[in-house]
Curated annotation (Swiss-Prot):
Family under the similarity heading: Belongs to the RuBisCO large chain family. Type I subfamily.
The record's free-text note on cofactor binding: Binds 1 Mg(2+) ion per subunit.
Subunit structure: Heterohexadecamer of 8 large chains and 8 small chains.
Function: RuBisCO catalyzes two reactions: the carboxylation of D-ribulose 1,5-bisphosphate, the primary event in carbon dioxide fixation, as well as the oxidative fragmentation of the pentose substrate in the photorespiration process. Both reactions occur simultaneously and in competition at the same active site.
Organism: Rhodomonas salina
Alphabetized GO MF terms: magnesium ion binding; monooxygenase activity; ribulose-bisphosphate carboxylase activity
Name the record gives this protein: Ribulose bisphosphate carboxylase large chain
Catalysis: reaction(s): 2 (2R)-3-phosphoglycerate + 2 H(+) = D-ribulose 1,5-bisphosphate + CO2 + H2O; D-ribulose 1,5-bisphosphate + O2 = 2-phosphoglycolate + (2R)-3-phosphoglycerate + 2 H(+)
UniProt-annotated location(s): Plastid, Chloroplast
Site, Transition state stabilizer: residue positions: 337
Main EC class the enzyme belongs to: lyase
Amino acid sequence: MSQSVESRTRIKNERYESGVIPYAKMGYWDADYQIKDTDVLAMFRMTPQKGVDPVECAAAIAGESSTATWTVVWTDLLTACDLYRAKAYRVDPVPGAADQYFAYIAYELDLFEEGSLANLTASIIGNVFGFKAVNALRLEDMRMPVAYLKTFQGPATGVIVERERLDKYGRPLLGATVKPKLGLSGKNYGRVVYEGLKGGLDFLKDDENINSQPFMRWKERFLFGMEGVNRAAAGTGEIKGHYFNITAGTMEDMYERAEFCKEIGTVICMIDLVIGYTAIQSMGIWARKNSMILHLHRAGNSTYSRQKTHGMNFRVICKWMRMAGVDHIHAGTVVGKLEGDPLMVKGFYDTLLEVKTEVNLVEGLFFAQDWASLAKCMPVASGGIHCGQMHQLINYLGDDVVLQFGGGTIGHPDGIQSGATANRVALECMVIARNEGRDYVNEGPDILRTAAKSCGPLQSALDLWKDITFNYASTDTADFVETATANR
């Protein structure tokens, strides 16, 4: 319903006096705002500076991430400014944190270019994090409308098609990162790839910082690595892969490396998060056109995702990367050496794998999300995991995951192939126990010990790593706890 003449006159008189007017009075706060299906929604954790009203702080975030500047500008009158202003519509105190608040903000869809993560992020995180009115600010979650998601390609391959190409079903996929990640020659690198795949892994991979250094140029690595893949595939009768990292200093170099991957016949290639949103989308489009599985290493994410009060929650990165077109993304292990609270990791995996997610505050999901027709993205678990944790990994992470045992393969006392075999046997015995209806979580250690009686490599691995864990407190944990009456 259109506003009355009196209402428009009042708004003009209130908002368009020269000078500085509080953001809330400028129209960036509306407690009665009715959310539209086409709105982009964002929820920020904000810590206002001392003396700053939380509502005004939320309005300032809405303003500075949409149309506002620090003073009244008359050119607002030349636009549909009331439509284009983002609306902060809700502010809640954070449980157990007296100085923190959750601010909910709605953005008109027309504020964003279709299919452009760069444009979306330029608004949502482009300027507000340096705003003096906030002592700290963190983007916790977003809701993308279906109309907006339809402008993005989504994963280049998706979980279902990836399994069809690999002909592997009913279990997690197994991988490992070549170690040491820097310093090997091409020939030795290819030997590691062969040993790991021959021993039973589905994938080997480059690490985030192996590109084209003086000790091993990229083409040398690709050729020797692919020789290892082909020999292992021929010897095992299984489809195998190696994630060749095509990350480079320019898009031209990345496309050259990607085309060479296609030429030599690999099923998968890899990029790093640090190449940027536009480059990631570009490679996602290339991968879809060229039937290539695209793995993303989340290199650099902890610089802004790990701290609880400032930066960005990793679940937002998961959403953006599913939109951008990657097929794999590292998303936590729960039991490994890297940051990963169980509830938070569950939220990340659901974000990547579910067709729809509902509000689940315990897992950190503040909005319901319909993923429209975007394919599923395969989570990857890596960092400090070993075969003795197999029952825990399957319990926490399920089947649609790549379990990557780098040190847990290449650090095996009997060699790389034995390390791979230990992981494959541990996985298969645990999946069989689960499928038979056994209590594999509690019986897991016994199941592994029984399997080890007929598998020397598994016995050696269990003897070496025993029950090694990395029991450090997570810095990013749930703000809400599940109670007996929750979700009723």
